Amino acid sequence: MIEEMRKLLATLDDGEISPSAYDTAWVARIPSQSNATCPEFPETLEWIAHNQLPDGSWGDRNHFQIYDRVLSTVSCLVALKTWNLGHDNINKGERFLKQNIYKLTKDKGDLLCGFELIFMTMLEEAKQKGLDIPIDIPALKILQGYRQKKLQKIPLEMVHSIPTTILYSLEGLQDHINWEKILQFIGTDGSFLSSPSATACVYMHTKDPRCLEYLKGVVKKVKNSVPCQYAIDLFERLWIVDTLERLGIDRYFQPEIKNILDYVYKYWSDKKGIGWGRESYLKDIDDTSMGFRLLRLHGYKVTPDVFLNFMSSEDKFFCFPGESYHGASDIFNLYRASQVAFANDNILTKAKNYAHKYLSQLDKAYLDKWSAKKNFFQEVEFELSNQWNSCLPRAYSKSYIHNYGPNDIWIAKTIYRLPFVNNELFINLAKEDFNACQSIHQSEIQTLLRWWAALKFGDLPFFGDKVVTAHFSIASCMFEPEFSELRLFYTKYALLSSTLDDLADYYGSPAQTRCILEAIRSWDPSLVSHLSEEVQICFSGLYRTINEMVKSASKVQTGSSINIREHMQEQLAKLISAQLVDAEWMERKHIPSFETYLSNATVSVGMQDLLLSSIFFCGESISKHLMQEIKNSRCLQLTCLIARLCNDIGTYQFEREKGEVASSITCYMRENRGITESQAIEHLQGIIDESWKELTEEFLTPSQIPRSIKRLMFETARIFQFIYPKKDNFKDPSKAMASLIQNVLYKPAE
């Protein structure tokens, strides 16, 4: 299956797209250069004759969309009548229209692009050719009204002076176009906005050879027919990469994805963005948003200022420059792009606010302008409820596997399909991969539960069963099979760190913490033998587990000059030293300065020691130089800061009831007299938000620190953002959290 997909990705060209009967019929009407009584493209007429559907219509065989069927059918009938061919086809088509044209109703949001312009013109041509089509029906009068309103809004001077989306529907404005002037907007490929029908119409009025060469090329490539748009090479490539990533199977195709993004970047403009094809001179916010997000995620240099091209002075956004409308899917992709913001990316903040407000007000019955996806509204709901920096990747993939439609259709002048974006191959691999990884994760949980029982941690009165929750957190982020040892180590270490923290909370005193610190520095369990049974159980488990981890790490770090046992001891000692400071503050009821608190608390939160010990299992060789780079990295500092502040906000009420007085909230309130608790939390949330922007930039910008290690730090920050939204979901999982764990770790993808 993977090899089959690689072969598919290796064949990407100008875009694989389903044929359009409507556009093919326009091309079929073109007279031959050598004999005007014959068609230039007789093969397209054969295609029309052989692709009429059983009910007499033309259009998508597997999806009945009334506007698509009626428009395509009228277009095909006009083409056949032009050459006085296919009388049986014409009779069947006329019968279909008589039975179905009345189904056209008032626009419910499902009109095709430019339908109100092109359909009424098409009907007039059908009437002139003597086709028997009913035209005196209420729906057509309504459509005629739509057409008149649209024409009143279109300044014809602008149509002839700057490129607009009207070029895509020129065949609907034939009586209003100056054909000589309009030729200034012909694309370098000879098309008008990549539309075969619009280009065919222009050719029949101008006989411009560039148009004909474009159409010849499309008919040849698509085999006797044409699609509604061509080429769509950038659009197809971007949506393929996005689909692979959302389904969680992109790791199998990294070389192919790099080739795709290199191709896209070649046509990227920081000033204008991109359109659906490399020849598209009219850029759009949909392709630009997708391109920006994917290119930034993969380390390419792109500027968010590109979105100025799609923003009004009132901070509103639109799909095409100089126009005033947009659909939901394009703003949805703008919203997704806005979440990969770096520091000072102010326009992305504006984009996020605008998109979030618009998407939050969508009705479930909304019909998108550009696509008819299986579960589009559910996709929007999920994204709004799960921001990128707090959504665990495997939870995201499980959701998208459910929402993905292998048979989804897309909307332009007609409906169309993208078989390289929506297909059974992608979804089948995604399900197979998800379930295979899930099976490995379940096996790891059993290993961890046996380890847990052997250490007798379950006997501790203060420590609940956190094994599954702890494992779920890392397994939902670093989920690949090759990170199995990392997940086991990370989970064990996280549980040990949490045990030490709980031990300090329930039984700790500065004196006891000093004993534990000395035992860690000496690596001697006998130094805690005089302490309580709970302390001895904890230290014994810590001692045995760290020794096992050192052995495992030494096996995978054979060339490292680092003394791994001493390194892990050092990290543990730093953690306990920081917890000792916490204990002393608590004993004295001392509230330090905000800066002093954070200096210690970003260590006592336990992420620095966890990460600096876990990195041995990231598949990279860790030298002393690299270790020092990681220790000093802004990436590590920001991860610890986010973890601490998220933890403080989530556990504040519980810790206060327990008697703890020093937290980032209380320290900030003490320094800023008169502010409320909620104001302090709002300030801390602001720090978290800005830290995320900086961390995102650190993570996505190439550096000496390997990507897998930066990813582990980034995912750890993401875990804390997820675990501690407003409460402690680690010690006391909510029902939603428990349900998510069940869904990701135990329910297979079906």
From Swiss-Prot:
* Main function: Bifunctional diterpene synthase that directly generates the endocyclic double bond, as well as the hydroxyl group: produces an endocyclic double bond isomer of copalyl diphosphate (CPP), and carries out subsequent replacement of the diphosphate by a hydroxyl group to form (13E)-labda-7,13-dien-15-ol.
| Family stated for the protein in its record | Belongs to the terpene synthase family.
Q: Where is this motif: DDXXD motif?
A: 501-505
Taxonomy of the source species: Eukaryota, Viridiplantae, Streptophyta, Embryophyta, Tracheophyta
Q: Which residues form a coiled coil?
A: none
Query: What GO biological process, any one, is recorded here?
Result: diterpenoid biosynthetic process
Bound cofactor: record note = Binds 3 Mg(2+) ions per subunit.
* Protein name (Swiss-Prot/TrEMBL): (13E)-labda-7,13-dien-15-ol synthase
Q: Which cofactor does it need?
A: Mg(2+)
**Binding sites annotated in the UniProt record for Mg(2+) 1:** 501, 505
A molecular function (GO) term: magnesium ion binding
Q: In which pathway does it act?
A: Secondary metabolite biosynthesis; terpenoid biosynthesis
Show the SUPFAM superfamilies listed in the entry: Terpenoid cyclases/Protein prenyltransferases, Terpenoid synthases
Keyword flag Hydrolase: yes
From what superkingdom does this record's organism come? Eukaryota
